[in-house]
């Protein structure tokens, strides 16, 4: 596979995650999964270009992003569990009412 095929694949993943955020404003779990898909596509780009230029910095940076993404998803899921225990629903509209 050429680098263009890899770039098209990661661009497709990025667009899929972006459309998941834009089109689904009701379910916070799908929004969180779409954010993770965005981060995965960015990580794949870092790895592809690090292999292309034969440099390890892109792979190290990709591991750093994976660590931050894992922490972000763990914190997001913990907040959703607490919110569900308190209110019985994880609707975006109820979460937006908390900021008022």
Swiss-Prot record:
Transmembrane residue ranges: 3-23, 28-48, 64-84
Biological process terms in GO annotation: ATP synthesis coupled electron transport
KW Nucleus (keyword) present: no
Catalytic activity, EC: 7.1.1.2
Catalytic activity: a ubiquinone + NADH + 5 H(+)(in) = a ubiquinol + NAD(+) + 4 H(+)(out)
Function: Core subunit of the mitochondrial membrane respiratory chain NADH dehydrogenase (Complex I) that is believed to belong to the minimal assembly required for catalysis. Complex I functions in the transfer of electrons from NADH to the respiratory chain. The immediate electron acceptor for the enzyme is believed to be ubiquinone.
Location (main, coarse): mitochondrion
PANTHER family reported for this sequence: NADH-UBIQUINONE OXIDOREDUCTASE CHAIN 4L (PTHR11434:SF16), NADH-UBIQUINONE OXIDOREDUCTASE SUBUNIT ND4L (PTHR11434)
Family: Belongs to the complex I subunit 4L family.
GO cellular component: mitochondrial membrane; NADH dehydrogenase complex
Name of this protein: NADH-ubiquinone oxidoreductase chain 4L
Record keyword Chaperone present: no
Cellular compartment(s): Mitochondrion membrane
Topological category with respect to the lipid bilayer: Multi-pass membrane protein
Annotated Gene3D superfamilies: 1.10.287.3510
Record keywords: Electron transport, Membrane, Mitochondrion, NAD, Respiratory chain, Translocase, Transmembrane, Transmembrane helix, Transport, Ubiquinone
GO MF term list: NADH dehydrogenase (ubiquinone) activity
